[in-house]
């Protein structure tokens, strides 16, 4: 059994990824999580009636290489289903799809983009100009320094329709912030890595199980190395002696020791765990007080019949941004195109609908709606939010007008992500600290990514790398981005050499 032990405080993706990496490297890891479930902000809850729901539907993209590596390490890769088509619907009920063609990047999306019904020709022309600027700049176009994404779009002469029906739709969902409060750097990065530089970057991966089930392999992997995962185990404060971490005081008053510690908790929680002098003016954690957060609201509906055949929909011109067909996504039935394709006999109807039986023998369907940057909903009652979403469902899914709602619930994550406002990077600390054996993990640390699951895993790997270096075992854990392909590869080289 390894003689060196590492405490990991926090069982979200940042803590789990660092813990798994260290366990794989032979260290004895003790992971402490305050809540009963692992996953942090990407987890599941059990309702009083026994239904298990995600706090908010989380998705990955093909460009999230470190998250994919983490899922592989914990045996969860097969629980993620990837989709090659993105489905959109506007207030008039018009459907549009975006998918890659055989053309090389950045042209691979062009054929389906040209057929996107919700955009006018002028909208498409302006979007093409901005996309070309991103591609020719190798993901780093001019006029972005200190600018918001909205500023940059205006500088690129984007039409109102392009901003509201394309840029805003994609970016508010991806970054959980409004365009006027988003650093242009991060907005552009979403399109460069997800839609332009590689033909696989845009593919949407959705868990086929409740989020908490994705992390079941973590306990076993850590235990195999002599470690332990302790849920319902909160930490009151970290003990520091001189310039070294000495241990942690738990909420029950007991103390636990370790040869090193990775603090993988939300940035505001960290301030309450660490010595006060670490957050004083000029100290390493001073900037954490300046990091703002953004809310996400999820709304869950159970209908008495099938009302939706697509696996998911992105809504235009609505408060609701995404609808996820959880009945279909959890069914094990594969989809090909916009209709359901059963994998076996008698699993679907001729029209492509998936039929899920209730106890009474009737059809039932569970939909989850997601609203990012939901500032306007934070103070509204759950009844008001449910009514709003029910009206919007009727716009895009006519079958819901006659369907009965068996039950509905609302989950608000008021501090779901950190806000990627211009200049936020100056407040984000590194994974190392002045305390020799204390390291930080969290999407709010310096990862080069915004507040995403990919960013959380990157932080975990970087913290584990720092810990391994501390123990004299330097190891590279961070996975490379998808390769830049097609014309983008040529433009990226020219941009890097300063010849663009």
Predicted regions and their residues:
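Helical element adjacent to the flavin cofactor pocket in flavoenzyme catalytic cores
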Residues: 190-252, 259
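N-terminal Rossmann-like FAD-binding beta1-loop-alpha1 element of flavoenzymes
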Residues: 4-31
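Flavin (FAD/FMN) cofactor-binding core of flavoprotein oxidoreductases
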Residues: 174-175, 388-433, 484-485
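Mobile amphipathic helical/loop "lid" adjacent to a hydrophobic cofactor/ligand pocket
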Residues: 67-68, 72, 77-188, 199-201
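Glycine-rich FAD pyrophosphate-binding loop
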Residues: 23-48
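Mid-domain catalytic core of redox enzymes
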Residues: 2, 234-339, 343-346, 350-353, ...
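FAD-binding beta-loop-beta segment adjacent to the flavin cofactor pocket
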Residues: 324-334, 413-440, 444-447
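Active-site-proximal substrate-binding core of FAD-dependent oxidoreductases
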Residues: 468-500
